[in-house]
Design a protein with these regions (language model features):
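Core solenoid repeat modules with strong leucine/isoleucine-rich periodicity
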Residues: 23, 46-49, 220-221, 225-231, ...
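Intrinsically disordered, low-complexity Ser/Thr- and acidic-rich flexible linkers and loops
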Residues: 160, 234-246
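Right-handed parallel beta-helix/beta-solenoid
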Residues: 21-60
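Fungal secretory targeting signals
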Residues: 1-21
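Beta-strand repeat architectures
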Residues: 61-69
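N-terminal extracellular ligand-recognition/capping segment immediately after the signal peptide
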Residues: 68-106, 124-128
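Short glycine/acidic-rich loop motifs that flank beta-strands on beta-rich extracellular proteins
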Residues: 81-83, 101-107, 127-133, 151-157, ...
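Right-handed parallel beta-helix
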Residues: 89-97, 115-126, 138-149, 163-178, ...
């Protein structure tokens, strides 16, 4: 599994690096330069915008290029509570720091109902409603995305709009989001190298109605403190295939979680997942909670302190079933109630056990 994820990650990095070796290098088709209150958007030798509006400069540069062409935003600035839109086939590099405000229901950057959009590099600051917002995308590639936020939600794939397919992400680093770092709905075919979440209010990575997913590392520190959320959460029929089955199709190489709320959380008829390894310590809520989930395998790893490892079920859904957990658990408890169907435990360490 680890080898497979490394191969997938290498392929993703190759996809990103073939666009450019570093942000803004080479010969972008359009650029945004300037500082302070003066910005220029250029395409080739022609200026397509000159003025004080940073967002307008970026949008003018994007609107000036065609599918397959690239914009490099070299300048740093603020777009305020506004939105940048990226059309099909365009490549957007945010080399400078793009500071954003909160536009209710919208992303600071959006790509909706598009094919082949790439964002190889982005640095974002501020307090967005959504930092990046997507729906109806196909062959979307996100590369090195860094968000140093003071609130809001990092990356959001919408619930009530068109589904997405073949989404690839490189290294996503989100600090300070008030909600989730990365939240998905309705993706078939998802590859993520790494999600790093620091001081995030809700989830590090939240997968919902997402199938055929391969994730390398989910790394959370002080994620979801004081809440029922988790560094890594699967919810709302995540991993359930169109057939209704939970054949394994969600693969996660490793989850690391320190402090915060829960470490790993599966809920609301999700499943079909294999987690190769966990490293969980001092979680304020459950280190692991699997509740009404089906065909989940945790192949190994460690739990140290924190809230209990728990298998549970609510009355409104079928009881949890076909679960296999292999762990070393210390300074904690392992609790199964109500009893799952076809439950396989392999627990070492000094944990107290209350299982069926």
């Amino acid at each position: 599994m680890a080898r497979f994820i490394k191969l997938v990650a290498a392929a993703l990095l190759a996809t990103v690096s073939c666009v450019n070796a570093a942000c803004g290098d080479g010969s972008p088709d359009a650029t945004v330069t300037g500082d302070g209150g003066s910005f220029t958007a250029s395409k080739g030798s022609s200026n397509v915008y000159s003025g004080s509006d940073y967002r307008a400069a970026i949008q003018a540069a994007l609107d000036s290029i065609s599918s397959g062409q690239r914009v490099a935003v070299i300048a740093s600035g603020s777009i305020g509570a506004n939105t940048i839109t990226i059309d099909s086939g365009k490549i957007f590099e945010g080399c400078g720091a793009i500071d954003v405000g909160n536009r209710a229901g919208h992303g600071a950057i959006e790509s909706l109902d598009t094919t082949g959009v790439q964002i190889p590099y982005l640095t974002m600051t501020g307090n967005p409603y959504f930092g990046l917002r997507f729906y109806g995308t196909k062959d979307l590639v996100l590369g090195e995305i860094t968000m140093n936020l003071s609130g809001g939600l990092g990356i959001r794939f919408e619930r009530d709009y068109a589904a997405n397919s073949n989404v690839k992400m490189g290294t996503i680093t989100v600090t300070g989001a008030g909600s989730h770092a990365v939240e998905t709905w309705n993706i078939d075919g998802l590859t993520i190298d790494t999600v790093v979440a620091r001081d995030v209010g809700e989830c590090g990575l939240l997968l919902q109605t997402t199938t055929n997913a391969n994730v390398g590392l989910v790394d959370g520190d002080n994620v979801a403190a004081g809440t029922g959320y988790a560094t890594f959460r699967m919810a709302n029929n995540n991993g359930q295939l169109a057939s209704g089955e939970y054949t394994p199709n969600v693969f996660v190489d490793k989850v690391v979680s320190r402090g915060g709320g829960r470490g790993v959380f599966c809920v609301s008829q999700s499943g079909g997942a294999v987690i190769s390894s966990v490293d969980l310590a001092d979680n304020g809520n459950n280190a692991i909670l699997l509740e009404n989930c089906y065909n989940i395998v945790i192949e190994g790893g460690t739990v140290s302190g924190g809230g209990e490892v728990r298998i549970s079920s609510r009355d409104e859904f079928p009881v949890s079933s076909d679960l296999s957990i292999t762990l070393t658990v210390n300074d904690n408890t392992v609790h199964e109630s109500p009893c799952a169907t076809n439950m396989d435990w392999s627990i070492s360490g000094d944990a107290s056990m209350d299982i069926c």
